[in-house]
């Protein structure tokens, strides 16, 4: 497909990973994906639950020893004692399952619904609605299972991914680029890009083009993870002035980058955002971009 600005998006097989402990903001899903789930190039994975007939697309829980490869034993035990633990494990399992299937070529890209975010979870700390760092766990898993070597992570949540920064700052095989207010510094392959308090859609996408695209082209990751939050949208709790249209603009640019540098392998992991109506409005068109519509 060719858009008015001349950009192109290639068709792709897209996986959608969902479970039913997602919280109020995702109450309208998966019903809100009507017209998407019926496509031949869309594959829907969800958790097995009592009364659901087993299918080839069930989401299985990862073992805890995979979590311990990224987080301390004490931290895992603290999370285990919370009432959110089951949903946390399903969220992380979705990210791991998506990365395995994208890597193996079963699907080209993926969107992972999570009830609990990623990027505030560090080695021994969690907060801000983030318990385990699913992207970091998925990266570790790909290294062990497939000998994968180079990864890129772009974070467009409105807040700094302090947990991801801590985990990746000394890892020379992970390019981590975070767009957030108060950025403007880098360490090894960790880059914080400063975003003004108020920013236009075009300015924000330009930050991706100038700060992530050339680094990804030079770094040549084998797969890209996108920590996507919609909390920076107008009317959300992290409002930085972005319109609802900005998210499909980001998706088109990041899919283009993935198509060019890593054979289209990109996994979108839902992070911040609280409004139910906003999720219903933003997520379906973003997934359509992944499919190549």
For every predicted segment, state its role.
Residues 1-62:
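N-terminal low-complexity, Ser/Thr- and acidic-residue-enriched intrinsically disordered segments
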Residues 71-293:
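A general "terminal functional-core" signal
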